[in-house]
Curated annotation (Swiss-Prot):
Its main location: cytoplasm. One of its GO terms (molecular function) is rRNA (cytosine-N4-)-methyltransferase activity. The lineage of its organism: Bacteria, Bacillati, Mycoplasmatota, Mycoplasmoidales, Metamycoplasmataceae. It catalyses: cytidine(1402) in 16S rRNA + S-adenosyl-L-methionine = N(4)-methylcytidine(1402) in 16S rRNA + S-adenosyl-L-homocysteine + H(+). This is Ribosomal RNA small subunit methyltransferase H. Keywords: Cytoplasm, Methyltransferase, rRNA processing, S-adenosyl-L-methionine, Transferase. It is an enzyme of class 2 (transferase). It is found in: Cytoplasm. The keyword Methyltransferase applies. One of its GO terms (cellular component) is cytoplasm.
Length: 299
């Protein structure tokens, strides 16, 4: 199995400013691309905690990380539940959080997971294979209005109403490639030639299946309480919807606490910055093209 190539790896490691004795939480472990480099920098007193819903990813990461060190804990659950596990471990503060919100290339490569719009597979798209809701339930079960809402809110799908109507009129849709064909045939030829419209539709359905935006918002609301002074949270985003959520959340944290009209020195509790991939990284890793690394530091 070819390992998932982590995006913005150098920037992540540099900006985490890893304390060898610190506690670092990778909330989207994947195949430990980022985590393996974090673990290499930790001493025996440090700890890495990794979350992933995908049990296959957890097992592969365990094998990979075990070759580096044993001071890690892997948790097969959605990162939205991170607080429950940190409380169980009596951890009140961490030295860094990392989220990589992209779908791993391994998940895309496995046609049977149904994430890829270029491979024949079932309409699945579940990151947690134990959950009941699948892409098939949405594609073949939701009404036109609900589909349209998902397409607009999760991916800004162009001509979402036409795509939703096309799906409803062509049911039952059996697999990923049939869905791609239905999407393409629902839209004007000029739009289809310009850009593969299936990409945004698949993104919207995947987000709905896994409740990704709600999970992200719930996590952000609890996250900063766990950061130590001078520690950071790093979030890699890949599309405008999730990026806007992170950007707006960070923006609210750095807002001046005092009325600007008052003669009081500006007080800020957080510092933020954004990093984009270099042309060199994009050339080496196509996935990096749409990525952004957003960083918030507790002061």
């Amino acid at each position: 199995m070819q390992l998932h190539k982590p995006v913005l790896l150098k920037d992540v490691i540099e900006n985490l400013e890893i304390n060898p004795e610190g506690i670092y939480v990778d909330l989207t472990l994947g195949y430990a691309g980022h985590s393996s480099e974090i673990l290499k920098k930790l001493s025996s007193k440090g700890k890495l905690i990794g979350f992933d819903q995908d049990s296959f990813a957890i097992e592969k990461s365990r094998q990979r990380l075990s070759q580096i060190s044993d001071n890690f804990v892997l948790i097969n659950d959605n990162f939205v539940n991170f607080k429950v596990y940190l409380d169980k471990m009596n951890i009140s503060f961490v030295d860094g959080f990392l989220l990589d919100l992209g779908v791993s290339s391994v998940q895309l490569d496995f046609a049977h997971r149904g994430f890829s719009y270029s491979k024949l597979g079932p309409l699945d798209m579940r990151m947690n294979l134990d959950q009941p809701l699948k892409a098939d339930d949405i594609v073949n079960g939701y009404d036109q209005e609900s589909l349209c809402k998902i397409f607009i809110e999760n991916a800004d799908v162009k001509l979402a109403k036409q795509v939703a109507k096309g799906i409803v009129n062509n049911r039952p849709i059996k697999d990923t490639l049939e869905l791609v064909e239905v999407i393409r045939s629902s839209l004007p030829a000029a739009l289809v030639r310009k850009k593969n419209p299936a990409k945004a539709v698949f993104q919207a359905i995947r987000i709905a299946v896994n409740d990704e935006l709600i999970v992200l918002k719930k996590f952000l609301a609890q996250s900063l309480d766990f950061l130590k002074k001078d520690s950071k949270m790093l979030i890699i985003t890949f599309h405008s919807i999730e990026d806007r959520i992170v950007k707006d959340f960070f923006k609210r944290q750095v807002k001046n606490k005092h009325d600007r009209r008052l003669p009081i020195m500006e007080q800020k509790d957080y510092q933020v910055k954004t990093i984009k991939p270099t042309e060199e990284e994009i050339a080496q890793n196509r996935r990096a093209k749409s990525s952004k690394l957003r960083i918030i530091k507790k002061l």
